[in-house]
Amino acid sequence: MARIGIVVSEFNYDITYLMLQKAISHARFLGLEITYVFKVPGTYEIPFAVANLLKRNDVDGVVALGAVIKGATKHDELVASQTARKLMDLMIQYGKPVGLGIIGPGATRMQALERVEDYARRAVEAVAKMINRSKSLEEKKFAGETVFIE
C-alpha cells in the first residue's frame, strides 16, 4: 500500500478544510495510506512541509492543498507560481511525486469553492498514479521492445 502525506494551508481554511476532507476520502477510496497531515499557515509555507515529508522513509508521495484567492495586487500570482515551481524542484530532488492541489492564482472565493473537489481529487490521483508508475518502472527492463509505463 502506498503511503502519502498531505500538506494543507490554513489560510482560506474554509476552502482548504473542504479540500482536505475530499483528499482524505479519495485517498482512502484509492487504497492509499495517509501517514501524515501537515498543516501550514499559508500556501507559501507548503514547500517547507513537503520537503520535510519527502525526506521520510514512510512517505511515498505528498499531496499539497491550498487556495490562493485573487486580491487587489499580484501577490496571488507570486505566491502560486513560486510555490508550484518549488514543488516541482522538490519532486526532482527527492524522486517522489507531489500532487499539486493549489487553487489559483486569479480565483475568486466563489470559483475556489467550486473547484474544491476537483483540485483535491486530481492531486490525490496524480500522486497515486505516479507512485504506482514509478514502482512499475523499477520492475521493468528494456528487452528490445518499447516498455509502456501506465
From Swiss-Prot:
Which GO terms fall under biological process for this protein?
riboflavin biosynthetic process
The catalytic activity of this protein is classed by the Enzyme Commission as 2.5.1.78
Positions bound to (2S)-2-hydroxy-3-oxobutyl phosphate = A72, T73, R115
Q: What residues form the membrane-spanning segments?
A: none
Query: Could you tell me the superkingdom of the organism this chain comes from?
Result: Archaea
Q: Which reaction does it catalyse?
A: (2S)-2-hydroxy-3-oxobutyl phosphate + 5-amino-6-(D-ribitylamino)uracil = 6,7-dimethyl-8-(1-D-ribityl)lumazine + phosphate + 2 H2O + H(+)
Q: In which pathway does it act?
A: Cofactor biosynthesis; riboflavin biosynthesis; riboflavin from 2-hydroxy-3-oxobutyl phosphate and 5-amino-6-(D-ribitylamino)uracil: step 1/2
Q: Name one GO molecular function term.
A: 6,7-dimethyl-8-ribityllumazine synthase activity
The entry assigns this protein to a family as follows: Belongs to the DMRL synthase family.
**Name this protein carries in UniProt:** 6,7-dimethyl-8-ribityllumazine synthase
What species is this protein from? Answer: Staphylothermus marinus (strain ATCC 43588 / DSM 3639 / JCM 9404 / F1)
